Amino acid sequence: MVALTEDTQANANIGRLTVQTVEIADETTAIRCLDWDRERFDIEFGLRNGTTYNSFLIKGEKIALVDTSHRKFEKLYLEIVAGLIDPNTIDYLIVSHTEPDHSGLVKDILQLAPNITIVGAKVAIQFLENMVHQPFKSLQVKSGERLDLGNGHSLEFVSAPNLHWPDTILTYDHKTGILYTCDVFGMHYCDDQTYDENFFAIEEDFKYYYDCLMGPNARSVLAALKRIENLAIKTVATGHGPLLQVHISEWLGRYKNWSLEQAKTETLVALFYAEDYGYSEHLVHILGHGCTKTGVAVELIDLNTAEPQEVRELVTQASGLVIAMPSQYSLTAQAALNTILAAVHHKQAIGLLESGGGEDEPVFPLRNKFQELGLVEAFPPILIKEAPAQTTEQLCEEAGTDIGQWLTRDRTIKQIKSINTDLEKALGRISTGLYIITTKKGEIQGAMFASWVTQASLNPLGVAIAVSKERAIESLMQVGDHFVLNVLEEDNYQGLMKHFLKRFAPGADRFAGIKTYPATDGSPILAESLAYTECEITSRMDCGDHWIIYSTVHVGRVANVHAMTAVHHRKVGNHY
């Protein structure tokens, strides 16, 4: 288990790239492509620690390559593979799923090994035919089927659709006990340690990855866990981050517990998208992340591959529906839309968005049909006319939060009304100041009215803020992010409070009509605030329905030394 090779290249545009090869078991080599400086992986991930793209080579009597890598590693990766083995002798390329960060070099491998057989789910093979635009030998596999490489390497395939692509399969080697999982159980974390020895260093990234990619498909996670429960797993060979070996039972147990908690909710939102069309899947995942922040369950389903009965059952169960427009020329997707229209019921929540594929089903006629059937629009249609910017992605996440909050409004009202216990009344006597948190990350700005704020340390100077998991600003308050804590003045807070407490439409400018000036990091400072401090988030603690955000304070200023901070007096402790 020693690093055999390590090659590096640096590029001003993409940062430092490293390829590391490690023998992880008998006749099995990991090819880890380390992307040290990547700072962003869609809106879900503001990366603190880069990421990796992991590929694997199994040398039995026959040879199999499990996944490839991101196209940015083309030169390094192909040189490493050629150094390990003559590519023309590779018999099989197993494609766990067709997301470009793992299948980006499939076409290059085909050029080096034209007789190779590509192994994957039926949907994956179909997607690849549209990606590589050349004929290739293929083998479609289903759950429970095996591929014998010889020398004891019997590979068993496990179907895991919607984790987080519809074509996902897992691969288990019965000789080595290695389960190849691609995105499942992964994390965006880049370092030169092959395995998960440092549990606490990667724990937060593991949870964040689950929340963003796997949580929206909790039911599918549970189904996959059920299928692998009888496998004697010694190593989980993930597609991103360190391989899991030291703490396997803990990681898998957390996936199960998180998914059980997510799946047991009574409120379900069905998210329909068209795989491999426009930005459909990308935007729906972001929107689904916004939904799950409010405590509702979500289920993603591909309009191009789902069976009519599957669509009908999901629509019947769901309290809300979100549809990313498929191509108007896809007969399968059109049939799925007709099934949805026939299965919806009165007062379901509905949200529609374009996919930006150039041939989208027109959104407004479909919107009218749903309204005629008595469905309630959760957010205005989201129109996509160009490649989604950060602001568009923020709009989608906030739209997801909106539909989730609308569906859980009765639960929230019930909680507010349950104020009979002495404990809640006593807790409500804890008074705090009034503040507005403002932040900016790239093109995105956010703001939040807050009262659960306190100084938390003297050396270094630090503050702690409780942020509800369903707040829109939560995605902008990750470790390493910056924000401004604006302190409101006792006799001059009503206008700002009224403005920032109002309900904003998804993507709306929180600062329209408000005078601000930029902090050091660009976050807005409110001109009418009594005082402000510029803060950097250094840790987050999971506290039930809130995050406790601890931040160090770097800059501060008081506008009026004679004024007092506005104070928030409550009588009950079960709501703000």
Curated annotation (Swiss-Prot):
What the entry lists under CDD domains is as follows: flavodiiron_proteins_MBL-fold
Q: Record-annotated residues binding Fe cation 2?
A: D101, D183, H240
- One matching Pfam family, short form? ODP
Residue ranges, annotated region (Zinc metallo-hydrolase): 48-240
Q: Which residues bind Fe cation 1?
A: H97, E99, H164, D183
Query: PROSITE patterns given for it?
Result: FLAVODOXIN_LIKE
What gene makes this protein?
A: dfa1
Name it: Putative diflavin flavoprotein A 1
Which keywords fit this entry according to its UniProt record?
Answer: Electron transport, Iron, Metal-binding, Oxidoreductase, Transport
Instruction: Identify the InterPro entries for this entry.
Output: Flavin_Rdtase-like_dom (IPR002563), Flavodoxin/NO_synth (IPR008254), Flavoprotein-like_sf (IPR029039), Metallo-B-lactamas (IPR001279), NADH_oxidoreductase_modular (IPR051285), ODP_dom (IPR045761), RibonucZ/Hydroxyglut_hydro (IPR036866), Split_barrel_FMN-bd (IPR012349)
Query: What lineage is on file?
Result: Bacteria, Bacillati, Cyanobacteriota, Cyanophyceae, Nostocales
Q: What class of enzyme is it?
A: oxidoreductase
Annotated spans, Flavodoxin-reductase-like: 432-576
Q: What does this protein do?
A: Mediates electron transfer from NADH to oxygen, reducing it to water. This modular protein has 3 redox cofactors, in other organisms the same activity requires 2 or 3 proteins.
| Textual note on the cofactor | Binds 2 iron ions per subunit.
Domain (Flavodoxin-like) spans: 269-431
